[in-house]
Amino acid sequence: MNIRNDVQKALQHLFGRTAVPQETSKVNEALNGEKRLLLGKVLRLLGDQHALIQVGNQTVQGKLETQLRPQAYYWFSYEKKTAEQTGRLQVVQSFDQNPKTIQDAAGKLLNAISVKTSNAALMMTGAMLKSKTPVTENDIKTAVRWMDTLPSQDTKKAVETVLFALKRDLPIHSEILNGVHAVKSPVPLHQHVSQLLQAIDQNPQQSQMMSKLKEAVTVLLNSEIDVHAERLIDKLISLTDNTKAPSPTNTAGSRELSTPAGSPGKASLPIANHTAEQGSIQEEPVKTAADIPIKEARQLLVKLTESAEKNSLQIVKEAANWIKAAASSGDSKSLAASAVLQAAQVTDQEAEVFLKAVQQTAPHLADKADVLSFLSKVKTAIGARDEVAFIKAFEQGSAVTSGEMQSIKLALSALRASHEVAEPVKQEADQLFHKLNGQLFMQQDHPSYSQIVMSFPMFSKSGVQDMTVLFKGKKEADGKLDPSHCRLLFLLQLDTLKETVVDCLVQQKVMTITIETDFELQAAIDPMVPALKQGLKEMGYSLSGVNAKKRVHTEEKASIDQYITSISDQEVDVKI
């Protein structure tokens, strides 16, 4: 749960050295030997004409050349020679919260640091003053330069992005700001993925890096069919050897099952990377009553294994190819005639059995085990844990490396560092990269609670959408999250209800659910409440109620940023 803090520290270490040439965010180092302008808050007077000043998330001591008021804000000229213990503070500008005073102060300060007083720069600097957030000269210059790269219509959102970064003590660096800004954008994650794939396909010259990135994106797109393939193989194995359950062994991203009797002994069968979920899948009854003949099931498993070896594929990937062939075929005869099954010498009878097995093992995203397996594959394909690799690379000053199969994050990182990528591809890669990384900066980890944000682009046969989850929960004494006091917020795009927000608030294991849509749903929800109450009771929770709320329309679409802003400063027992 602390990965966001680890990433933030690594970024501060990295960007503290590289943010802006000749300038640094480390206040004490930056002020040695030269005069700087900075916005500071007087924390307290130390006596003997000295004061303790807060600048950003650090403090400096200085000798005063004029009288100051504690808890007031001033723009200081601060000069400190290397041999001196404390620097000299001279007030350049004091200000109050009068709008005209703030606007005038913003203009004077921009002139003092030789920054052009554009409307965007004035708006941003004025917002900093109004927010009473201590900042440095370097913060303003970096933020203004970053805002100059954005369209004018994004100025308001850009100011919000800068203030958000300052409030979270994030380094004011273009990469950080781009990440936060991307999360605030209403463009869904799945749209960025689709646009990137389209840009790669339309590029006439395909480089090795683009091929790797396309492969990583394809893995994401195939998440649901891979779950289907794993369930199909599990089904065939259980039929051919129903005397004992296959023993799972976790590997790097796959579960290995030993080859059943009658199958070639060379290949092992990598099935699923979620033993618990797959166990649940095996225990639940099939979705149709029709049985699959054991003889044909064994032959299919043998031919799948042989075909996978011949094509140098994992058996799951080979099974996925067979399922795709089944999806494009109308019946068992046309399936048997397909190139994929013909190459494996699958008979008409075996093709008919295979179609039946495909129908019985099809995943449903209303099923808990299927959803967990699907989301876990999406998370792995994106590279949700690859921040660890980024941290190590930052600390060691080396390039990010990975194994044979790259996640989207690692492939994006490698592609963005290349100078041999077409501009349309690079632009789409940048947007997706910032959208993914920006989620890290939305997370918070405090001694008493954690707030986690995750967005999953879901490419399914039932539709394409993002599922965004915001979790906020209290911590127990050992640092683990307390499931009896937490809050879960889901942002969904559903086929019928469209934009849907599900807000689950848990206090003392009592859950209150609020569902927000464009429709009046209370009458439709009420009959389902008893079953939900019973299900929660079995999990050790009670239900206080399910409330349907019709959305009040605004100009902007709902985004996770609204809800992060709404509850970031609230305890988990306070509702929106």
Swiss-Prot record:
Compositionally biased intervals (Polar residues): 241-261
Ranges where the record places region Disordered: 241-270
Superkingdom, taxonomy of origin: Bacteria
Protein name: Uncharacterized protein YlqG
Gene: ylqG
